[in-house]
A protein has these predicted regions:
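Short, basic, low-complexity termini and linkers enriched in Ser/Thr/Gly/Pro
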Residues: 188-205
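Juxtamembrane/disordered regions of integral membrane proteins
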Residues: 1-193
C-alpha cells in the first residue's frame, strides 16, 4: 500500500509539474501576450503543485497554496538572476551555458523542494533527499536547455520553452519520488530534525 501511494503521488506531482511548465510558457504561444499572463507565468509551477494538493490530498489551506505560489514566483526570478550572473562571468561557450543553467536549476530546486516539503509533508525531509532533489534540479536545468537548443538553435543564452517544461516536470517527479515519510528507524546524522519521540506507551515487557 505504501509503495502504491508513493507511485500515485509521484505520478500526480509529475503531471502537476508538466501542467506548470505548460502554463509557464503558454504566454509565448499568444500573439499578443497580456502583461498579466507574463507576470503570473513564473508562479505557475507553485500554483500547479498547490492545485495537486488541493484536489488530491484535500489540503484546502489557502495560506499554504498562496505561500507556495508566491515562493514559486520569487524562485523563478532568483534562479534567472543567478543563471544570468553566471553567464556574464563566463565566456560565451556551450560549457558556460551548462554551468549557468545548472546553477539556476540548483537554486530553483533547492528552494521549491524545501518549500513544498515544509508546507505539505507530514515528516521533515532528510538532507539526502534534499540533496538528490537539488542536484537533480541542476541537471534538469542543463538537460532542458540543451533540448531547447535542438529545437531553437538560435536561442543563444535565452531560456527556451523546453527548459521550463523539462525542469518543472522533472522536479515534480523528484519531489514525489523523494517525498519525506516517517520511517521506523533510528535517527541518523543526515536528519534535519530529531524524529518524533516514541509513543508514550511503549508497552515495555
Amino acid at each position: 500500500m505504501a509503495a502504491m501511494g508513493r507511485t500515485a503521488r509521484t505520478l500526480g506531482l509529475t503531471l502537476a509539474g508538466l501542467v506548470g511548465g505548460l502554463l509557464t510558457v503558454s504566454y509565448l504561444l499568444q500573439r499578443r501576450p497580456s502583461g498579466v499572463a507574463m507576470g503570473l507565468s513564473p508562479s505557475a509551477f507553485g500554483l500547479a503543485l498547490a492545485g495537486y494538493f488541493w484536489l488530491v490530498n484535500r489540503d484546502r489551506s489557502i495560506l499554504k497554496g498562496a505561500s507556495l505560489t508566491a515562493i514559486s514566483w520569487a524562485t523563478f526570478w532568483l534562479a534567472s538572476i543567478i543563471a544570468g550572473g553566471e553567464m556574464m562571468g563566463l565566456n560565451r561557450t556551450s560549457s558556460a551555458d551548462a554551468v549557468a543553467f545548472f546553477a539556476g536549476g540548483v537554486v530553483g530546486s533547492l528552494v521549491m523542494s524545501t518549500a513544498t516539503f515544509s508546507l505539505y509533508a507530514n515528516a521533515q525531509p532528510t538532507l539526502w533527499r534534499l540533496l538528490v532533489c537539488t542536484i537533480g534540479g541542476g541537471l534538469l536545468g542543463v538537460a532542458g536547455q540543451q533540448l531547447g537548443y535542438l529545437s531553437m538553435p538560435h536561442a543563444g543564452p535565452n531560456p527556451t520553452p523546453a527548459l521550463f517544461i523539462v525542469w518543472q516536470t522533472g522536479m515534480g517527479f523528484l519531489i514525489g519520488r523523494f517525498w519525506p515519510t516517517i520511517e521506523a528507524r533510528e535517527p541518523t546524522r543526515l536528519s534535519i530534525v530529531e524524529p518524533r519521540e516514541k509513543s508514550e506507551n511503549p508497552n515495555p515487557r
